[in-house]
Amino acid sequence: MSGLDINGLSMRFDLPNGSSVQALKDVSISLKPGELMSVLGPSGCGKTTLLNIVAGFLAPTEGKIELNGHLVTGPDAERGMVFQKGALFEWMSVRENVDFGPRMKGMPKAERDKIADHLLEVVGLQDF
């Protein structure tokens, strides 16, 4: 099926003291192309964990996610994530963060470099 299919998704985090936290348990969701969904709930209920798994940033403990019939195994150009607060990938330089989106879309490096140079100069961050 095309769209987003989440089947039997569970996520458990093991803690250093030997205990664990069950962040998600047996979540199943199906969205057809064009359908929208909001994820709402109190702090600590697993919203961010779910979205990080859908984006491919975390691997679930159990279950699977398929997007347009393809198994989600990591981040790629088919999915994105808008963070609650402004965020950069901490392990990347400012330039690498600016380059990330166009690179995921498959834009040629020369074109990405030109755009990154321009944008960084506009905001005065060309030296970062």
Where are these predicted regions, by residue range?
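Conserved coupling/switch loops of ABC nucleotide-binding domains, chiefly the family-specific signature
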Residues: 61-64, 111
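The feature captures the beta-strand-to-loop junction immediately N-terminal to the Walker
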Residues: 40-42
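Short coil-to-helix segment of the ABC ATPase nucleotide-binding domain corresponding to the Q-loop/switch region
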Residues: 92-99
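Helix-to-loop junction immediately C-terminal to a conserved catalytic motif
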Residues: 55
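Short beta-strand immediately N-terminal to the Walker A/P-loop
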Residues: 37-38, 81
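Conserved ABC ATPase "signature" region
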Residues: 99, 103, 110-128
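Conserved ABC transporter NBD signature motif
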Residues: 63-75
